[in-house]
Amino acid sequence: MVQFNEIYTEYENTKDVCKFCEIYKENSTATRFLLIRSLDKPSLTEIVEQYSAEDTSGNMKILTEKAFHSSVTIQQLVEYIEKKRTELIAQREEELNGLQNILNDFPIVNCGVRNDKVDDIIKPFVRNKSLKSFDTLIDELDNSVLPRIRQYCLWSYYNQTSNDIIELFFLKHPTVLPTLRKIHDIDFFIKVDEQILPFDLKFTHISDSYFDLASQGIIRNMDISHHDDFYIENDNNENEMQKIKSFYKNFKKKNRNLNLPNLKGLKKNDLCDLLASSGDPEAIAFINKMKDNHSSYVPSTSEELHSLEWWNYKYQGERLFCNNNRLFIFLAFKHKFVDGRELKGKTFEIGNKIKDMLGNITNNGMHTVKYFYDKEASLEGNYTALSLSAIYAE
């Protein structure tokens, strides 16, 4: 019999939820534990009252242990959580009432802060020894620091509110079993083919880095000696960014009279806008060709989505690394060289994509993603996870 402290400690410390589920798969122990771990305190109290001879005293960990040692079954846990669904939906709908109207009125905003570190804006300001008068200090604060913090606050609101509205589509779907409290690296469970599988929800735009690799060719790996599902066809070829830079550099040299700025600090969209503003037929033809190519890199088939899912696992940052089952919602512009984060406010359209995906879900429809991770020595190794995704692109 699995000891509670063993399984509890293993889960709290793991960066590989899939491995955890594999270790404790016998008698569906992992599933039962995770369902119990996902209950809030009032729910744990009710479970202990109904299915255990123990009293209901103690903190969250003690109540979780008492519920774990009770007679409650997976089916009874599922039925209990299902009874809470209507209450949760009503609560979320009341909280979110009218907020879509605010999103509709939002200006286009960028985050403006890397890794949510607002202090990175404030530190240079407070350490700036060139501000020699109070007036110049206030001018720097009002015109440089505060606009960036305001932008970050607006983006954070837009991002969080969009998340909350879109998550309601999952809460309402009968295939999805919600968690009743936060549980690390699991947002909900999916019921499929008599299984209950934990999933983490990932909203993300398709990264520039993915488009660069896709432009070099992402190919299915048929060599079973390598764990990665895909590989890059030719990483010596110029990628999307390099092609745009090369054309811009040559165009700038041939058209010195235009006084085009140097490459440093310019992004794909900046370079294309500068080329387009020249009105040169060759430059415009090049941009149109690059946009057509860019559109072809936006996944439209299950196989293409599989490669995008693989990329997001393989190249995830080491700071927040986790190997867990994931349900991705990807956002992208087909003919613009900007990320698709502003599309997140299109909650109705994204909701329809979610309904279509969940309405046709089967075990066979999920992707088994295999990847080798080597961005951090302590995490290096072969990993396997289940993945699902939907994409909204314009």
Each PLM stretch: what is its role?
Residues 180, 189-201:
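Active-site beta-strand-loop-beta-strand hairpin of nuclease catalytic cores
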Residues 1-184, 203-394:
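Nucleic-acid endonuclease domains
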